[in-house]
Amino acid sequence: MAAITISSSLHASASPRVVRPHVSRNTPVITLYSRFTPSFSFPSLSFTLRDTAPSRRRSFFIASAVKSLTETELLPITEADSIPSASGVYAVYDKSDELQFVGISRNIAASVSAHLKSVPELCGSVKVGIVEEPDKAVLTQAWKLWIEEHIKVTGKVPPGNKSGNNTFVKQTPRKKSDIRLTPGRHVELTVPLEELIDRLVKESKVVAFIKGSRSAPQCGFSQRVVGILESQGVDYETVDVLDDEYNHGLRETLKNYSNWPTFPQIFVKGELVGGCDILTSMYENGELANILN
């Protein structure tokens, strides 16, 4: 989840491309995203949408219709009915009425409720600005106006919007990389491929030899295997048997090693469990959970 770089003037450049934010030492970095769905994804504030000038002015006027942060009523979060399930900008205050975070959401009530469950000590009240036409440009402008106002008054960014503060921000977990058994097909191995396979399955709790990667399986059986292992919350390794660059010769070598003719193949604690059908059966009857624990 990317951060948003904002200079002291909070000026956005007119480029439609998503660019990697450049952060100088003196440039505050603040975060727009809510931890909880439904929120919008804005990779950076160093861009605007490809609008005409009238369109940009229209977005500004719509966003400006939202009351200023100071003028907006502070609502107790405990009174759930008072928080609308609408799109817009919202500001979370702690029990001492100190601003903690400014975010945007398609459902403000749901986002605030989720914040309350996650960090109740930081959620005492909330200010809400409903945006009638919640496209990205309008919501960004409304959020920007509230942030600008707070910085102008206090000289600082709300804690939850600072770079590195993930209290209110959902972090997308990085998927584990797939194992590459060799440095490349044109590199001569000093250890036989079968020995590399043997080391891997014996030194890892769970290894799945699949078609494709864990993030993009190339067959339904491999996708099913990844889904089952993910559901178990187990740490597991994946090896792409279709990767002829870094796993060249793996398919035939693995068939000989395991004496199993098809893929995917799943090993648990050094022993072959079988393929997708067997793993699915073990998952459904509870046996898989037992051998993984």
Swiss-Prot record:
GO molecular function: 2 iron, 2 sulfur cluster binding; hydrolase activity; metal ion binding
GO cellular component terms attached to this protein's record: chloroplast; chloroplast stroma
Gene3D superfamilies in UniProt: Glutaredoxin
Variant or mutagenesis effect after changing residue 101 to Y: Enhanced nuclease activity
Binding-site positions, glutathione: 211, 251, 263, 276-277
Annotated phenotype, changing residue 161 to L: Slightly reduced nuclease activity
Chain positions recorded as [2Fe-2S] cluster binding sites: 219
Domain Glutaredoxin: 194-293
Activity regulation text: The formation of an intramolecular disulfide bond negatively regulates both the N-terminal endonuclease and the C-terminal glutaredoxin activities.
Pfam families: Glutaredoxin (PF00462)
UniProt KW Iron keyword: yes
Top-level enzyme category: hydrolase
Record: transit peptide: 1-62
Keywords: 2Fe-2S, Chloroplast, Disulfide bond, Hydrolase, Iron, Iron-sulfur, Metal-binding, Multifunctional enzyme, Plastid, Redox-active center, Transit peptide
GO biological process terms on file: monoatomic cation transport
EC number: 3.1.-.-
Entry superkingdom: Eukaryota
Subcellular location(s) of the protein: Plastid, Chloroplast
Cysteines paired by S-S bonds: 123-219
Assembly: [2Fe-2S]-bridged holo-homodimer. Interacts in vitro with SUFE1, BOLA1, BOLA2 and BOLA4. Interacts in vivo only with SUFE1, BOLA1 and BOLA4. Interacts with SBP1.
Family classification: Belongs to the glutaredoxin family. CGFS subfamily.
Domain notes: The N-terminal domain (NTD) (63-170) has an intrinsic Mg(2+)-dependent endonuclease activity in vitro. The glutaredoxin (GRX) domain (194-293) alone is able to complement yeast grx5 cells in vitro, but not the full-length GRXS16 protein.
Functional description taken from the UniProt entry: May only reduce GSH-thiol disulfides, but not protein disulfides. Participates probably to the maturation of iron-sulfur proteins and to the regulation of the redox state of the BOLA proteins. The GRXS16-BOLA1 heterodimer binds a labile, oxygen sensitive iron-sulfur cluster. Able to cleave linearized DNA in vitro.
Protein name as it appears in the record: Bifunctional monothiol glutaredoxin-S16, chloroplastic
Organism this protein belongs to: Arabidopsis thaliana (Mouse-ear cress)
Record gene name: GRXS16
